[in-house]
């Protein structure tokens, strides 16, 4: 941290939050989303474009890599989502029955690259969270009775046999699993009803961390088996 080197692949402007993703299977491989998806295999010293103008000039907003197969990548631009299964040589659009809303987040199951969750912004009731088990050929609406607020992020609990997922909304954190479309608020009056921008699970401590818009960083023990009983603690620094 004493010095930094600029490794941006292009002088073009990206999205407000330009996505970068590190391949967990090879830390020298980095992906960056601008008007194209850029890939580096040498830690950012050089970059190659692995999309062919599939976004028609739009910026790539989200990148999700499969941990089980590095050739499988999902990206989105605004309301469109794309998949490659050969490392970027060929891409297919997999919107199918998804709503034409802004995609805020994509996550891929760590052991099954065909299981994917996407979340949406906006204020259209019942169009918040979708899941696929076949790589995007078909999408299942799992929004249930979520309140009509934007969903900003989603995190999968890799320790859960029920494929538990947490979502960050404009009014805190909610939890559900693959067996139901029932969402429970995971705040319990400890975490303020505030915008959640990012969720991350720290498995060494078995805790979920929630980054808020203007209210700091909060953490909580992961849900085990009982209904959510949340007891957030506050950290003043990220």
Please place each PLM-identified region on the residue numbering.
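Proline- and Ser/Thr-rich low-complexity, intrinsically disordered segments
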Residues: 223-238
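Extracellular glycan-interacting surfaces
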Residues: 1-227
């Amino acid at each position: 941290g004493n010095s930094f080197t600029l490794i941006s692949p292009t002088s073009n402007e990206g999205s407000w939050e330009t996505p970068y993703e590190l391949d967990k299977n090879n830390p020298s491989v980095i992906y960056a989303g601008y008007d194209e998806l850029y890939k580096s295999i040498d830690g950012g010293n050089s970059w190659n474009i692995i999309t062919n103008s599939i976004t028609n000039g739009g910026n790539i907003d989200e990148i999700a890599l499969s941990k089980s197969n590095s050739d499988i990548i999902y990206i989105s631009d605004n309301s469109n989502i794309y998949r490659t299964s050969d490392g970027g040589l060929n891409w297919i659009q997999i919107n199918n029955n998804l709503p034409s809303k802004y995609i805020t987040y994509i996550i891929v199951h760590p052991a099954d690259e065909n299981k994917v969750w996407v979340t949406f912004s906006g204020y259209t009731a019942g169009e918040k969270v979708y899941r696929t088990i076949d790589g995007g050929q078909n999408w299942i609406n799992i929004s249930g009775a979520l309140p009509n607020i934007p969903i900003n992020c989603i995190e999968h609990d890799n320790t859960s046999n029920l494929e538990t997922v947490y979502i960050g909304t404009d009014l805190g954190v909610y939890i559900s699993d693959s067996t139901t479309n029932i969402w429970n608020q995971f705040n319990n009056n400890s975490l303020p009803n505030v915008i959640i921008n990012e969720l991350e699970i720290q498995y060494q401590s078995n805790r979920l961390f929630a980054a808020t818009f203007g209210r700091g960083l909060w953490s909580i023990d992961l849900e085990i088996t009982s209904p959510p009983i949340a007891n957030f603690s506050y950290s003043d620094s990220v």
